């Protein structure tokens, strides 16, 4: 029985891994009748609050936004930085961001787990994204080991995904 249980757990793990490889990031960002991906509160209240909170701690230099969605927060970051790189898994979200912002930012269509970034960054912003990742620890490790410049700063906001309001 122990071997049988071990085998079931292994199959379950393989099924989970297979499911993770088939994620459709374009579908995940779509609003439906019973699910909204983003709310006006995020844009009208949270975005200005986060910018005010981050602003005194931003370093001069470049910025990497991980999970740029449709560019709404990116627009606010572009008011403060000349060089902004955005990594987003949804091609549809990148297309919409480009329609809004043009070529003011550099867009990389990739998952964080596999992104090949050209440099290190003085500021890295990860807002309302960590809870969506398949392996958040691995992504945080990449941020620290590969992408954050010496003396760079990580700005991380993670909502309580299990809050009663969600």
Predicted regions and their residues:
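Conserved catalytic-core motifs of eukaryotic protein kinase domains, centered on the activation segment
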Residues: 135-136, 166
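Conserved class I S-adenosyl-L-methionine
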Residues: 155-166
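Short catalytic micro-motifs in class I SAM-dependent methyltransferases
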Residues: 128-132
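A short glycine-rich, Lys/Arg-flanked "PGG" loop and its adjoining helix->strand segment in the class I
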Residues: 137-153
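Conserved N-terminal segment of class I S-adenosyl-L-methionine
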Residues: 8-127, 137-140, 156
């Amino acid at each position: 029985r122990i071997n049988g249980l071990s085998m079931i757990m292994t199959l379950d793990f393989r099924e989970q891994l297979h499911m993770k490889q088939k994620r459709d990031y374009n579908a995940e960002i779509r609003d439906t009748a019973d699910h909204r991906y983003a709310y006006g509160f995020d844009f009208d209240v949270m975005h200005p609050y986060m910018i005010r909170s981050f602003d005194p701690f931003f370093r001069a230099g470049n910025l990497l936004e991980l999970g740029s969605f449709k560019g709404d927060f990116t627009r606010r970051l572009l008011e403060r930085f000349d060089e902004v790189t955005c990594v987003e898994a949804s091609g549809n979200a990148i297309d919409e961001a480009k329609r809004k912002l043009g070529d003011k930012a550099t867009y990389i269509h990739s998952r964080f787990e596999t992104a090949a970034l050209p440099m290190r960054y003085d500021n890295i912003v990860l807002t309302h994204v960590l809870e969506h990742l398949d392996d958040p620890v691995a992504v945080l490790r990449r941020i620290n080991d590969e992408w954050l410049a010496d003396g760079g700063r990580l700005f991380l906001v993670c909502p309580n995904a299990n809050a009663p309001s969600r």
